[in-house]
Amino acid sequence: MSEAEYLGGRLLLAMPGMGDPRFDHAVIAMCVHDEHGALGIGVGHVREGITLHGLLEDVGIDPGLAPDMPVLNGGPVETARGFVLHSDDWGGEGSVTVNGLCCLSASLDILRAIAEGRGPSRFVIALGYAGWGGGQLEGEMRRHGWYAAQGRPEILFETPTGRRWTQAWKREGIDPAHLVGQTGSA
């Protein structure tokens, strides 16, 4: 793939019938994609039983001014590892810009900043990530497992979690009700 074809900063939308129930109606914010592989954070499903306040308390941070919002299921890899996708108005150590979609941070510094009311203005927090080895995601794309939508911050930060998949399709001009789960050949 050429650099222009890599999917960093895009939203991957799971196609109906992709065959992996872990990714049913998944929305993945793609953070890194190159010849060595890809890493994205799932933003379409809530991790049941975990809220931001509980997560902060688990890592020894007083929730303070943090909103008690759901934590998202970021993916099936390293499910105890936390990631914050956020607006670019906070730039602590280790914060990385993801091609205009958002910034990515994975340090306790951002969690402390959020709890103290000095964090980013917009953010989502997830545990785990989705990862692919070199060429693996490209193969899944060829098999119609994923659709690469434009990376729209309003889908990530303003759309309720359970509506992100449908709204991302609609912003692409596609009615997801018309999608089929299988392809055929003539």
From Swiss-Prot:
Protein name (record): UPF0301 protein Saro_0683
Family the UniProt entry places it in: Belongs to the UPF0301 (AlgH) family.
Domain of life, per lineage: Bacteria
GO annotation, cellular component aspect: cytosol
UniProt organism field: Novosphingobium aromaticivorans (strain ATCC 700278 / DSM 12444 / CCUG 56034 / CIP 105152 / NBRC 16084 / F199)
Gene3D superfamilies per the UniProt record, alphabetical: VC0467-like
